[in-house]
């Protein structure tokens, strides 16, 4: 069973426990990022947004793989903003990356012409899917894609992740919410978790 306090640190890391959870994220998420970034199918001049960048592992990987991408990110943990900014200083200084601190649902700092938007292990922390998916749709250019990685519902149940922190969505619920938001060509597959792709 995951204690509620620890679970909340995965949602919004802060303080010393936040640093610990950040280090754990780096180790646990590496392979998931490898697969998700492969699915992004990076192209020259892509403009990319990560929602919930954590310590900045994924965006750093993208910056290292494709020097022509413009990379933006937003996270509502001030600690993660500080750590990710430090970890990606060279890309930020070079003007290739821009990181924001805040809630992506209410912020006005993001653009509306991203080629790809992605999030990894974030969806559980949204109490409903209608508003987040509508927001993502508004941030994408026509033909742009939204990529999600999430642990499957059964895994979260077995982990005994607290319901007060983790929303244990089924793949059916996610697909239905994506369709309702206006996404098309929704694809998903399972590989030690669920990978989902949807097109605007």
Regions found by a protein language model. Give the residues of each.
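Conserved beta-strand signature within the Rossmann-like core of class I S-adenosyl-L-methionine
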Residues: 143-150
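Conserved SAM-binding loop and adjacent beta-strand
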Residues: 17-37, 167
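Short alpha-helix
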Residues: 166-181
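Core SAM-dependent methyltransferase catalytic element
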Residues: 183, 189-200
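A short SAM/SAH-binding and catalytic strip from SAM-dependent methyltransferases
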Residues: 116-128
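A short acidic, Gly/Pro-enriched loop at the edge of an enzyme's catalytic core
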Residues: 105-117
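Class I SAM-dependent methyltransferase SAM/SAH-binding core
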Residues: 49-106
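A short glycine-rich, Lys/Arg-flanked "PGG" loop and its adjoining helix->strand segment in the class I
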Residues: 130-142
């Amino acid at each position: 069973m995951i204690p509620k306090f620890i679970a909340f640190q995965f949602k919004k890391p802060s303080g010393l426990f936040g640093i610990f959870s950040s280090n754990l994220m780096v180790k646990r998420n590496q392979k998931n990022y490898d697969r998700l970034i492969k699915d992004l199918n990076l192209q020259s001049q892509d403009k990319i947004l990560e929602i919930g960048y954590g310590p900045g592992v994924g965006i750093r990987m993208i910056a290292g793989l494709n020097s022509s991408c413009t990379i933006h990110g937003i996270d509502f943990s001030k600690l993660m903003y500080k750590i990710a900014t430090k970890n990606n200083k060279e890309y930020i200084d070079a003007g290739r990356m821009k990181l924001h601190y805040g809630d992506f649902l209410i912020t006005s700092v993001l653009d509306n012409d991203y080629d790809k938007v992605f999030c990894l292990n974030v969806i559980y922390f949204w109490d409903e899917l209608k508003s987040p998916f509508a927001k993502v749709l508004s941030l994408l250019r026509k033909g742009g894609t939204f990529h999600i990685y999430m642990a499957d519902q059964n895994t979260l149940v077995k982990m005994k992740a607290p319901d007060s922190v983790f929303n244990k969505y089924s793949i059916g619920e996610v697909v239905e919410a994506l369709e309702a938001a206006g996404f098309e060509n929704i694809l998903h597959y399972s590989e030690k978790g669920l990978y989902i792709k949807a097109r605007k």
